[in-house]
């Protein structure tokens, strides 16, 4: 380990910054954010540094660097464009026992500045030992997306109860277990969402109860159309916190790999006419698991409120007083259309888009065909693979031309994606001959003509295939 990671308390400590350019400005911002009493030595200052000096946030020492300026300093930063000056600052600081950083010169530095994720009082630092700063910044950018701003609020909330928790749980292990239950789950969500009053009341209740009766919750999460890169940050965080996950056939296997490793997995089916669990049983299972104090992830393909029966599930949760949260996902229609190069609306082709389901109810496809066959619109059919022939014929029987462009997109947004494009007359045969199976969507409308020109997604030579009618 080349550098020992520490955090310095610099509030009201004297620090010297040598240099007045843009690089020095970046260092000044960090030092001021830490509360340092900052002096900047340089003949001239960049405009923003000069503005900070005018406002009294730092002191400008006009002129050139001299060793005596280091006297009484706690920390020094050399940020000029002159390597000799920077090295002189480093040598003089070393001689006085002052921590010194030389920008872009780890060898001359006694300390380096890491890439920082600031969720004060929570701080995360990432460093590459000064060898590849760009890599550290890249990792910081990834972590930024996984650590919401609300974590700072959560850290302050926890700090305010630290003494009370320590008094209630003298045993270190018991205290740790208590904090683990508090810092993940509904109480933490309430804090991060700004409902601190409710969180405080719940926290006081839990402390008084000795941490018993951990409250469970259900997270209804849209997993998107299949590509893990299309998950929302919130969805990913909840997937990695869940104690148990209920998933169905429409959730891509790649997405399940992102669920917490030790989470219990419950397959609930939902394939056409082959449900591992009936919907009522799924609803009740969500209630039962939450009542056991578990964080339950109900993971659904696409968006839970678009033909996902999410409304039925949370209605049951609400009836039983179970805490729940809904995380929207990219609905399959949006994902499939975008990755197949088929705009759902287009000024020249379609002024509206309609989503329908191709599932039969009471033995027939009960849709408003008069509305669906109007010109200048796109119709997207969910769950229509098994009824494709009937659907396409119904479009024609109700007024759409048999030559109307139509497409089916299978396993949209994944490497297994296949798109077959044809017409209402030809599509069922194309789907059958190419073995198109669920999960797949059918898109009907003139916008399908654009797929030949706008199809862009192809991970490799053999993935994301587009098949056009001969």
Curated annotation (Swiss-Prot):
UniProt-listed SUPFAM superfamilies: NAD(P)-binding Rossmann-fold domains, Siroheme synthase middle domains-like, Tetrapyrrole methylase
Any coiled-coil regions, as ranges: none
GO biological process: cobalamin biosynthetic process; methylation; siroheme biosynthetic process
Positions of modified residues (Phosphoserine): 128
Residue ranges of the region described as Uroporphyrinogen-III C-methyltransferase: 216-470
Binding site for S-adenosyl-L-methionine: 225, 301-303, 383, 412
Catalytically driven reaction(s): uroporphyrinogen III + 2 S-adenosyl-L-methionine = precorrin-2 + 2 S-adenosyl-L-homocysteine + H(+); precorrin-2 + NAD(+) = sirohydrochlorin + NADH + 2 H(+); siroheme + 2 H(+) = sirohydrochlorin + Fe(2+)
Binding site for NAD(+): 22-23, 43-44
Superkingdom to which the source organism belongs: Bacteria
Pathway: Cofactor biosynthesis; adenosylcobalamin biosynthesis; precorrin-2 from uroporphyrinogen III: step 1/1; Cofactor biosynthesis; adenosylcobalamin biosynthesis; sirohydrochlorin from precorrin-2: step 1/1; Porphyrin-containing compound metabolism; siroheme biosynthesis; precorrin-2 from uroporphyrinogen III: step 1/1; Porphyrin-containing compound metabolism; siroheme biosynthesis; siroheme from sirohydrochlorin: step 1/1
EC number(s) reported in the record: 2.1.1.107, 1.3.1.76, 4.99.1.4
Region (Precorrin-2 dehydrogenase /sirohydrochlorin ferrochelatase): 1-203
Record carries keyword Methyltransferase: yes
Gene3D superfamilies: Cobalt-precorrin-4 Transmethylase, Domain 1 (3.40.1010.10), Methyltransferase, Cobalt-precorrin-4 Transmethylase, Domain 2 (3.30.950.10), NAD(P)-binding Rossmann-like Domain (3.40.50.720), Sirohaem synthase, dimerisation domain (1.10.8.210), Siroheme synthase, domain 2 (3.30.160.110)
InterPro entries found in the cross-reference section: 4pyrrol_Mease (IPR000878), 4pyrrol_Methylase_sf (IPR035996), 4pyrrole_Mease_sub1 (IPR014777), 4pyrrole_Mease_sub2 (IPR014776), CobA/CysG_C (IPR006366), NAD(P)-bd_dom_sf (IPR036291), Siro_Cobalamin_biosynth (IPR050161), Sirohaem_synt_dimer_dom_sf (IPR037115)
Entry GO MF terms: NAD binding; precorrin-2 dehydrogenase activity; sirohydrochlorin ferrochelatase activity; uroporphyrin-III C-methyltransferase activity
Role description: Then it catalyzes the NAD-dependent ring dehydrogenation of precorrin-2 to yield sirohydrochlorin. Finally, it catalyzes the ferrochelation of sirohydrochlorin to yield siroheme.
PANTHER family noted in UniProt: SIROHEME SYNTHASE, SIROHEME SYNTHASE-RELATED
Family per record: In the N-terminal section; belongs to the precorrin-2 dehydrogenase / sirohydrochlorin ferrochelatase family. In the C-terminal section; belongs to the precorrin methyltransferase family.
The protein's name: Siroheme synthase
Taxonomic source organism: Chromobacterium violaceum (strain ATCC 12472 / DSM 30191 / JCM 1249 / CCUG 213 / NBRC 12614 / NCIMB 9131 / NCTC 9757 / MK)
High-level lineage: Bacteria, Pseudomonadati, Pseudomonadota, Betaproteobacteria, Neisseriales
């Amino acid at each position: 380990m080349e550098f020992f990671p520490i955090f310095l308390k610099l509030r009201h400590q004297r620090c010297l910054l040598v240099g007045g350019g843009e690089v020095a400005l970046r260092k000044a911002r960090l030092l001021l954010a830490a509360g340092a009493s900052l002096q900047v030595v340089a003949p001239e200052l960049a405009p923003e540094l000069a503005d900070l000096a005018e406002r009294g946030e730092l002191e400008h020492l006009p002129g050139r660097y001299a060793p005596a300026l280091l006297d009484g300093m706690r920390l020094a930063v050399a940020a000029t464009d002159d390597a000799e000056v920077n090295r002189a600052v480093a040598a003089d600081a070393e001689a006085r026992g002052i921590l010194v950083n030389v920008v872009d010169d780890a060898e001359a530095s006694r300390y380096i500045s890491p890439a920082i994720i600031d969720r004060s009082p929570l701080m995360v630092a990432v460093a590459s030992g000064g060898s590849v700063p760009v890599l550290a910044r890249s990792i910081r950018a990834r972590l930024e997306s996984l650590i919401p701003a609300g974590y700072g609020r959560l850290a302050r909330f926890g700090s305010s109860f630290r003494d009370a928790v320590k008094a209630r749980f003298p045993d270190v292990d018991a205290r740790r277990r208590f904090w683990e239950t508090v810092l993940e789950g509904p109480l933490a969500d309430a804090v991060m969402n700004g409902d601190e009053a409710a969180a405080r009341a719940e926290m006081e209740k839990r402390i008084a109860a000795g941490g018993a009766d951990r409250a469970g919750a259900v997270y209804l999460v849209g997993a998107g159309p299949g590509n893990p890169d299309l998950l929302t940050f919130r969805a990913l965080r909840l997937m990695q916190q869940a104690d148990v996950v209920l998933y169905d056939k429409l959730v891509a296997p790649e997405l399940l790999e992102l669920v917490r490793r030790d989470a219990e997995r419950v397959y609930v089916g939902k394939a056409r006419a082959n449900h591992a669990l009936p919907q009522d049983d799924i609803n009740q299972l969500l209630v039962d698991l939450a009542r056991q104090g578990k964080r339950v992830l109900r993971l659904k393909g696409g968006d839970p409120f678009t033909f996902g029966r999410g409304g039925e599930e949370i209605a049951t949760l609400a009836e039983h007083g179970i805490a729940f949260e809904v995380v929207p996902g990219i609905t399959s229609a949006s994902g499939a259309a975008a990755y197949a190069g088929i705009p759902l609306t287009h000024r020249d082709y379609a002024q509206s888009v309609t989503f329908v389901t191709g599932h039969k109810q009471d033995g027939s496809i009960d849709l408003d065909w008069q509305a669906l066959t109007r010109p200048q619109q796109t119709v997207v059919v969910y769950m229509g693979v098994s009824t494709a022939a009937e659907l396409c014929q119904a479009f024609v029987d109700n007024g759409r031309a048999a030559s109307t462009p139509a497409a089916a997109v299978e396993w949209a947004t994944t490497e297994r994606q296949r798109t077959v494009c044809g017409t209402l007359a030809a599509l069922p045969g194309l789907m059958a001959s190419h073995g198109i199976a669920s999960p797949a969507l059918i898109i009907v409308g003139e916008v399908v003509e654009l797929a030949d020109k706008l199809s862009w997604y192809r991970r490799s030579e053999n993935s994301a295939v587009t098949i056009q009618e001969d």
